Amino acid sequence: MAKTKQTLTQLALLVGLTATGLATFTAQADKLAHIKAKAVVKVATFDANPPFGSVDAKTHELVGYDVDFAKALAKSLGVKLELVATNPANRIPLLQSGKADLIVADITITPARAQVIDFSTPYFVTGQQFLVPASGGDKLDDYSKARIGAVKGTTGEQTLHQRFPQARVLSYDDIPLALTALRNGNVQAITQDSTILAGLLGEAPDKAKFKILPELLSKEEIGVGVKKGEPALLKAVNDELVALEKSGDAAKIYDAWFGPSTKAPQPRSFTIEAK
């Protein structure tokens, strides 16, 4: 009898642990259902990183490229959007702690980060580009033996030596000094991250004299961050990103923040593709 009771107790304990495990698994793996039940999605985004995310001086609301994508994702899920302001260091902790359901904050997809969180298909692609005189060649290879300015100690400087070993790479302390060298004819091109070059050119009084080549010397893909173990939510995000591309809305969002009429214009050199 004692043995029977012991067996029943063990079975009850096993059933209890199994039920607890299933409940935990369901809670962890059903974030999409939780979002829809709460009718709100919490999205971590920047509040001081234009044009991706910043506070509008007039409305005091968050605006930007990332914000527009966050709005589109919320609309596709049929829920309200709650923006959670963040900085680079806090993006992943906010997601892991449950204070944010998604990261839409200019976060580059890297192998190290992919071990911690899942990423959507890229919705923005950036990388190292060339700023050259308006009359210069339109391809990177046109500058394979040129004098090229780069910022000292950057990965861009290293990439130039690898890609164009016959080029003469001149290093500068910052990108404004490199632009001055380009203006003076000391170099035939300068290189830096595409968004930085776009901002630099946008503020230049003589911007008509220069152009940014659309081809990327290096490539960095930006994706939406999703907590590990949420395949349904990840699929919903990917499906909407691809739908935005097919409808043309993704290109419209891009043009609103990086198009010809913006302060930091740069050509769109990518499309959002199914993962």
What are these regions (language model features)?
Residues 67-76, 136, 146-147, 154-155, ...:
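Extended ligand-binding regions for polar small-molecule ligands
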Residues 53-57, 70-79, 156-173, 201-205:
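Ligand-binding cleft/hinge of the Venus flytrap
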Residues 31-106:
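Extracytoplasmic small-molecule ligand-binding "clamshell" domains
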Residues 75-76, 84-85, 89-102, 116-118, ...:
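Short helices/loops that flank or line small-molecule/ion binding pockets
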Residues 159-172, 241-275:
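Ligand-binding clefts/hinges and TM-proximal coupling segments of bilobed small-molecule sensing domains
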Residues 124-131, 194, 198-238, 260-275:
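Periplasmic-binding protein-like
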Residues 67, 82-93, 135, 152, ...:
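Short helix-initiation/N-cap motifs at beta->coil->alpha
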